[in-house]
Amino acid sequence: MPELPDLAAVAAELTRRLGGRRVIAATAPTPILVRATPEDLGALPGVTIDGAERRGKFLLLPLKRAGKIERMLAVNPMLAGRFWITGSAERVRARTGLRLQLAGDEDLRYVDREMLGKLYLLGPDRLNDIPGWSEMGPDADAHDLTLDVFRQRIRRHPGELKPLLRNSKFVAGIGNAYSDEILWTAGLAPFRRRSTLNSDDIDRLYHAMRDVLTHATEQLHVLVPPDIQTQHREILQVHLRGGEPCPRCGRELRQIGGREATTFCRTCQPPM
């Protein structure tokens, strides 16, 4: 599932390639993926894509008319949702949720082979209508998420550290992969409970979160390919590397779980 660094890179690429492009037609070949009526889509011709933004695990495309944002396209790609920029004459793939035909004979298409993603087309003042939006905490890389704010917020969220980092009510944008990376960098076990952390542990967790996300975002801005597929995560130190040597101590990394695997080092990340 794309996380904060992946989506930041995709948003930058979408902005570079689509900023200022005019929509001439909009359809939903697989309408179950799109929270919009045919009338909503029919009103889009003439709007301009004003780049792309990211909030939590959502991509946001502001759609402007006469210099004013008229609609927001909010996309949570989940496990397999992908954007494609392709020629308008290209065959429309199965499970294409949204097709925006652009001036210049190109399309922006959203394809989701797992049919799990969600697209919302709504007014710019209606984002709170998206389930869970109003409860979302600050982005994990937000400038105003200072160390002091982090200390205050973490006191309100009990439980194990890995689910805590993945809880969008605490901080938004972190999923299974980067929670492993952050906890390994901080030297904290994923199953350790927040109540066992001292002030130094909390500070170390905060700085690890910021460092890991900053580094990954910088790397993915370089690696993101022209077709806007998220890059395979060679940049990750430990996630899904169970059985390999720990990059820090050389001991074997342990991995548990299946599709939602957790990878950690029992030496570098002691239980307490």
Task: Specify the residue positions occupied by each region the protein language model found.
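Gly/Gly-Pro- and Ser/Thr-rich, intrinsically disordered tail segments characteristic of DNA damage-repair
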Residues: 1-119, 242-243, 255
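Alpha-helical structural motif
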Residues: 3-6, 10, 19, 128-132, ...
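Basic, nucleic-acid-binding surfaces and adjacent catalytic neighborhoods in DNA/RNA-processing proteins
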Residues: 22-43, 53, 60, 65-70, ...
